[in-house]
Amino acid sequence: YYYGGTTPVERTFGGRWPFNLYATNGYIVYVMQPSGATGFGQEFSARHQNNWGKITADEIIACTKAFLKAHPFVDAQRVGCMGASYGGFTTMYLQTRTDIFACAISHAGISSISSYWGEGYWGYSYSALASANSYPWNARDMYTLQSPLFNADKINTPILFLHGTVDTNVPIGESIQMFTALKLLGKPTAFVQVVGQNHQILDYKKRAEWNKTIYAWFAKWLKNQPEWWNAMYPEKSL
């Protein structure tokens, strides 16, 4: 797990990402603090500006490989990753850069920097800092080459997209278009919309279902136990 947005990862249990529950499900949990997070000084956070994943992806890939090398009891063929918001973007972008992950989960992630730039309550204000002085018309390479959507054909990792249907921060279209691209490319993927929820899943029952969805996806791809997922989301033929 890596950050949601650029909020620092805390050394806590419980909360939105209950690492202790993943451990009780038999997973080894590795939590990273990539560059760009706030709270570690201006130089550290400034690495996020006009970068959109380059440094972060390099760090996550290098750290994951180093962790696997240092802990040989971890099965390198069964590693999953997940993140939310900017961390959801990171999840998508990582899969365009590496195949070291057996599966991935993006919650409320950004798939196209150019569409997110003018969307939602936060798109423009967030981009004013994260993409300072860079716009779709004067920084075309960043807006396209760093956008997962424009690199969807490079993805082989099964990705689960989760998104609240009334997300005002990262509009749900960001997940819809990436899911559509991967389906057209014949890549393994799934998309679960959480009805009536915003950027965070706050309704108790819906949050419980959201958590179960995450566990079921990991069980399917990391434990070779698809039964839970299939029971929750049986295949449908149109």
Task: Give the role of each language-model region.
Residues 1-2, 8-25, 31-238:
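Active-site-proximal cap/loop segments of hydrolase catalytic domains
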